[in-house]
């Protein structure tokens, strides 16, 4: 994510609703994650005893003056956004993760990941693409600027790590609450001095205007899903100047870190303009999405 509308500079308050006294350990684990990763979040914890139907979810998300988080009966943490429970839901990607390969995933064609690769997903969002990247055996560092989104990612990683079939994949994901530009500047010298940590690929999936999903001439294109609708509440599309800074810093970073040819891969809707108006070295696309590659 980039250009967050309200990335907190001080601690933000979130209401956390849980439904059972048996969830005390899970509530404590969430608070421990916040402390360990220094997230600027304060949880106002409350047990919710009434039936939490769709109408009540809608009321809670509309009436609350702070973000509302829900810990459900399966200990899945979600964010109530316009009455919808928004969560990474990594378990729903199991079939795709298991079958992921270059034949089925344009992302893997573009990144050319191997088990020895190291990649930075600099705009992690809900982490779905990070899972596909990590399915190759690669190590994936996930950067997420907004603390609320970072908490959802960390909680999902913690939950999925309890499932035996997911533990190895979860161990290859490294989630950091920071923005991409700060990370590139902060870690450049460290990575340059340690070849074992050298990065092969930087992956960017910045927010774009909602009308980018459709062809301006025909009106055809992909519909915006609930996850993307929720992100639009937290994030503004970057300005042209911000796009240029992001792409340039990513190119500079990977050119200094990669042991051989490095690449920056940018995900765009099929009909979206080029990031920073810069022509890529190569592109891969289908009917819905396009990956632009910048080789350095």
UniProtKB/Swiss-Prot annotation:
A GO term, aspect molecular function: rRNA (guanine-N2-)-methyltransferase activity
Domain of life according to the entry: Bacteria
A single GO cellular-component term on record: cytoplasm
Main location class: cytoplasm
Entry's EC annotation: 2.1.1.242
Positions bound to S-adenosyl-L-methionine: 205
Similarity annotation: Belongs to the methyltransferase superfamily. RsmJ family.
Listed Gene3D superfamilies: Vaccinia Virus protein VP39
Catalytic function, reaction form: guanosine(1516) in 16S rRNA + S-adenosyl-L-methionine = N(2)-methylguanosine(1516) in 16S rRNA + S-adenosyl-L-homocysteine + H(+)
Summary of the function given for this chain in its UniProt record: Specifically methylates the guanosine in position 1516 of 16S rRNA.
Keywords linked to the UniProt accession: Cytoplasm, Methyltransferase, rRNA processing, S-adenosyl-L-methionine, Transferase
Gene: rsmJ
Subcellular location: Cytoplasm
Pfam families for the chain: SAM_MT
Enzyme class: transferase
Protein name listed in UniProt: Ribosomal RNA small subunit methyltransferase J
């Amino acid at each position: 994510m980039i250009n967050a509308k309200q990335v907190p500079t001080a601690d933000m308050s979130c209401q956390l609703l849980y439904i059972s006294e048996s969830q005390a350990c899970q509530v404590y684990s969430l608070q421990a994650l916040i402390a360990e990763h220094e997230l600027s979040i304060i949880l106002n914890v409350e047990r919710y005893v009434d039936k939490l139907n769709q109408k009540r979810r809608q009321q809670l998300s509309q009436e609350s003056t702070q973000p509302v988080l829900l810990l459900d009966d399966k200990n899945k943490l979600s964010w109530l956004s316009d009455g919808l429970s928004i969560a990474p839901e990594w378990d729903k990607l199991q079939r795709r993760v298991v079958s992921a390969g270059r034949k089925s995933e344009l992302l893997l064609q573009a990144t050319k990941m191997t088990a020895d690769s190291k990649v930075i997903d600099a705009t992690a969002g809900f982490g779905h693409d990070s899972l596909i990247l990590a399915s190759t055996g690669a190590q994936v560092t996930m950067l997420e600027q907004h603390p609320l989104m970072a908490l959802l990612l960390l909680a999902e990683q913690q939950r999925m790590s309890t499932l035996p079939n997911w533990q190895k994949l979860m161990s290859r994901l490294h989630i950091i609450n920071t923005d991409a530009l700060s990370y590139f500047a902060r870690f450049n010298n460290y990575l340059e001095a340690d070849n074992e940590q050298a990065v092969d690929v930087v992956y960017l999936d910045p927010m774009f205007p909602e009308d980018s999903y459709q062809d301006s001439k025909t009106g055809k294109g992909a519909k915006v899903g609930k996850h993307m609708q929720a992100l639009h509440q937290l994030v503004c599309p970057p300005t042209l100047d911000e796009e240029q800074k992001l792409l340039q810093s990513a190119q500079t970073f990977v050119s200094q870190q990669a042991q051989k040819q490095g690449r920056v891969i940018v995900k765009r809707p099929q009909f979206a303009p080029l990031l920073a108006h810069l022509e890529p070295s190569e592109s891969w696309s289908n009917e819905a999405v396009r990956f632009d590659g910048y080789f350095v």
